[in-house]
């Protein structure tokens, strides 16, 4: 309470979302202290996870969709895909599988990749059906899986590393209803995953810093250029509204319209 008062009254931070973000490292430190016997559980329990209540109480540290949209063209993605076949590090190859699966599976967020369960996959219908972690919709999103996505899934099915979670990033008894624990786990994995992707991307001489969200944006921009409807794209990305999709990809939508008009004007 004293820290929150400090943020509000001294630092003049009136955004509850902003204050909640500053609480995360404190909670991480407390969690570490308890696990290593530095702080008693009786001290930590009443404090841990007490975020301020906002309109949306699910705190996900996913990158904002409104941040600068960095993406790879289909040609750059194909080059990166071929380059990554030469990567030797086992950990890097696991993370690269997650990255390319995100791209092939219609831009799944990292939180949905790490929480992807085998029960979400219909191998016969080549369909992924899952309630997305960050979306405000409660209905599952159905995502058709192409051959490249299926190839990755078949490979992981043969690995048999986890009876529940596809990419073995969570223990099979993980409680997905524990929003605080899910947030902390995803937040802890985010930096490590993106650090590996950035390193491999840099070694591949790519023009941008590669992150998991680059896979998402690359899928979206490719889909816009291929003529996918904004309604369908919004649904596949799990956006709360079409307006959110239009806002994020406004530049690319305008470019597509302009190019289409130029083509039409060339016709007699």
For every predicted segment, state its role.
Residues 135-155, 163-199:
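C-terminal catalytic core of Y-nucleophile DNA break-rejoin enzymes
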Residues 53-82, 137-146, 161-164:
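DNA breakage-rejoining catalytic core of tyrosine-based enzymes
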Residues 49-50, 54, 115-155:
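Conserved tyrosine-mediated DNA breakage-rejoining catalytic core shared by Y-recombinases
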Residues 87-90, 185, 194-235:
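Short, basic (Lys/Arg/His-rich) helix/loop patches that form interaction surfaces
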Residues 31-42, 102-125:
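Short, charged phosphate-coordinating catalytic segments
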Residues 1-63, 83-86:
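N-terminal core-binding DNA-recognition domain of tyrosine recombinases/integrases
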Residues 141, 247, 251-268:
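DNA/chromatin major-groove-contacting recognition/catalytic segments
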